[in-house]
Design a protein with these regions (language model features):
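A charged, aromatic-enriched C-terminal amphipathic alpha-helix characteristic of glycosyltransferases
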Residues: 307-330
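Aromatic "clamp/platform" in nucleotide-sugar-dependent glycosyltransferases that forms part
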Residues: 248-249
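Conserved acidic donor-binding segment of nucleotide-sugar-dependent glycosyltransferases
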Residues: 280-281, 285-291, 301-306
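Short alpha-helical segment that forms part of, or immediately flanks, the ligand-binding pocket
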Residues: 234, 256-261, 275-276, 282
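Conserved catalytic-core segment of nucleotide-activated headgroup transferases in glycan assembly
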Residues: 142-146, 158-162, 172-217
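Acidic anion/phosphate-binding donor-loop and adjacent secondary structure
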Residues: 99-105, 145, 150, 157-175, ...
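Short hydrophobic beta-strand element within catalytic cores of glycosyltransferases
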Residues: 265-268
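Membrane-proximal helix-turn-helix segments that form the acceptor-binding/catalytic region
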Residues: 61, 98, 105-132, 140, ...
Length: 330
């Protein structure tokens, strides 16, 4: 089949990673796959992903000259664009309920004053009469309950071979915690600055930051890894005891699972999607949203109790071993 994925952005982010992995997976099954973007994309923009150069990239204008057997909308604006393209079947791949990504209206701020309009238009996209596929149980249930949809659930895989090594950038300190924080520093619902502050309050020995933001240094962070290619991330994960990921909104977030595959554990908020693989006090620690005092308490407890930390990590490895790879998912 000839399959196309409409893509919002080729930049480093979890959603784009999922789309490129599925595209490469379908191509491995001998389908012809195109990644379709509004503008011409420089290959350097997707060089962060090891499979980016295996796929055909084309613009909206070029794709409008083609006929597809199957065309995927992949973010909230793209269902409104499908009429521009010729396809036998259109599908909406829903990775989150994206209206939750919009900040509240602020009439005094030109950038924020009309966010509710975009959020409403986003919500309307989930009522389109399209077959839907999603990656998380909570999204499937939301679409069933609120939008009268019957989506298929296809959980994200993970690139097992990428995380199969044992190299590190630096051996973990024997005393105290080295914590990894992941996410863009300027996206409000990722809560990276707040996470850094809580780790500092807890007296964490070292804080590392893995970010898609173009930054050389961040206040309160000991070591910053900015725009790192995907294949270079495992040694970063393996060098840290745990990931602290305190997002306010997620679809089915990948970084804790990646940390599990690298021998670590995670502290997360009870954000949507966490329960796909994180079990409280078994393979990680789950904190009620915005309970900052509990986050600090858990960090202090793990620092003082390495045996408990080790037990969480061992269970996280067992969870990782049971998780499907991208070949199975695609």
């Amino acid at each position: 089949m000839k399959i196309g994925f409409l893509l919002c952005s080729p930049e480093i982010n979890g959603g784009t990673n999922v789309i490129l992995e599925h595209g490469a997976g379908l191509q491995a099954y001998d389908h012809e796959v195109s990644i379709i973007t509004e503008r011409v994309v420089d290959p350097m923009e997707y060089a962060w992903h090891p499979k980016g150069d295996q796929l055909e990239w084309c613009t909206f204008a070029e794709a409008q000259e083609e006929q597809f057997d199957c065309l995927f909308a992949t973010w909230w604006e793209s269902p409104y664009l499908l009429h521009r393209f010729d396809a036998k079947q259109y599908i909406y791949f829903v990775q989150s309920i994206e209206s939750r990504f919009f900040e509240e209206d602020d009439p005094t701020n030109m950038d924020l004053r009309d966010h509710s309009i975009g959020a409403l238009r986003c919500d309307h996209s989930y009522f389109f009469s399209l077959p839907m596929i999603t990656e998380a149980t909570w999204i499937k249930q939301y679409l069933e309950k609120n939008c009268n949809q019957q989506p298929y659930l296809v959980r994200n895989g993970i690139c097992k071979e990428l995380y199969s090594g044992n190299s590190v950038l630096s051996e973990k300190p024997r005393q105290g915690l080295r914590v990894l924080i992941e996410g863009p520093v300027d996206v409000f619902h990722k809560n990276v600055p707040g996470t850094i502050a809580l780790c500092r309050e807890a007296g964490v020995k070292e804080i590392w930051l893995l970010t898609s933001s173009s930054v050389e240094g961040v206040e309160g962070v000991d070591r910053v890894f900015s725009k790192v290619p995907l294949e270079q991330t495992p040694p970063i994960y393996r060098s840290c005891h745990l990931l602290v990921k305190l997002s306010a909104v997620e679809g089915m977030f990948g970084p804790p699972l990646e940390m599990f595959h690298c021998g670590g554990t995670a502290i997360v908020y009870d954000v949507t999607g966490h329960d796909e693989y994180i079990e409280h006090e078994i393979n990680g620690l789950v904190v009620e949203q915005d309970d900052e005092a509990q986050v600090v308490e858990y960090l202090k407890m793990l620092s003082a109790n390495p045996d408990y930390l080790e037990n969480l990590c061992k269970a996280a490895i067992r969870t990782a071993d049971q998780w499907p790879d991208w070949h199975q998912s695609s």
